[in-house]
Regions:
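Concave beta-strand-loop units of leucine-rich repeat
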Residues: 1-9, 16-30, 36-75, 84, ...
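Residues within well-ordered alpha-helices
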Residues: 121-127
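Extracytoplasmic/secreted proteins, especially bacterial periplasmic and envelope-associated proteins
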Residues: 75-78, 123
Length: 156
C-alpha cells in the first residue's frame, strides 16, 4: 500500500511479486503496473492518472477499484476497448469505474470476418459481459456510477 507515500512516479527496474496493490489518492502515472507480477487486486480509488492502458497488461487482475478516480471518460473507453482487443490469457475481473463509459450498451457491429469490433466503452462492456468463453472461470462484473453490468449465463 503506497497510498500514504505521496508518490508522484513509481519506477520498477524488474518485476515485483505482488498480489495486492493500493495507491489511493494523489497523482501518478501507471506505467509501472505491467511489472507488478501476479497482482490480482488493485485499489486506485481517488487516483488521478491520464491513462489506464498500462493496466491492460495486468492479465491476472481480478479486482480493480477506480472509485472516485480522476480519469477521463476517453481513458476509460480506451482501457475497456483494449481489454477486449487484447483479451487472450486474461482472467475475469470485477471493475469499479469512476465514470459511465461512452456509447450504448449493445452488441458492436461485426467486421468483414465476423469479429465484433467495439467502437465505444459500453460496447466493450457488452462484449465482456456476453462472451461466454471469457466468463468460464468466473463472471466479468463492471460497476459504473449508474449501473452494474455482469455476465449472466444463458438459461436452457
Amino acid at each position: 500500500d503506497l497510498s500514504a507515500s505521496g508518490a508522484r512516479r513509481i519506477r520498477l527496474s524488474e518485476p515485483l511479486r505482488c498480489e495486492r496493490f493500493s495507491l489511493c489518492g494523489g497523482s501518478c502515472p501507471l506505467d509501472f503496473a505491467p511489472l507488478l507480477d501476479g497482482v490480482f487486486r488493485m485499489d486506485l480509488s481517488r487516483l488521478n492518472s491520464g491513462t489506464l492502458l498500462p493496466l491492460a497488461e495486468c492479465r491476472q487482475l481480478m479486482t480493480l477499484d477506480l472509485t472516485d478516480a480522476d480519469i477521463s471518460r476517453a481513458a476509460v473507453d480506451e482501457y475497456l476497448i483494449r481489454l477486449v482487443t487484447h483479451h487472450y490469457g486474461r482472467r475475469n475481473c470485477d471493475l469499479t469505474l469512476p465514470v459511465v463509459p461512452s456509447g450504448t450498451y449493445a452488441e458492436p457491429v461485426r467486421d468483414a470476418v465476423g469479429a465484433c469490433v467495439p467502437a465505444t466503452g459500453l460496447e466493450a462492456v457488452w462484449l465482456l459481459t456476453h462472451e461466454e468463453s471469457w466468463n468460464e472461470g468466473g463472471a466479468w462484473v463492471i460497476r459504473t456510477p449508474e449501473k452494474c453490468y455482469r455476465y449472466t449465463p444463458n438459461q436452457p
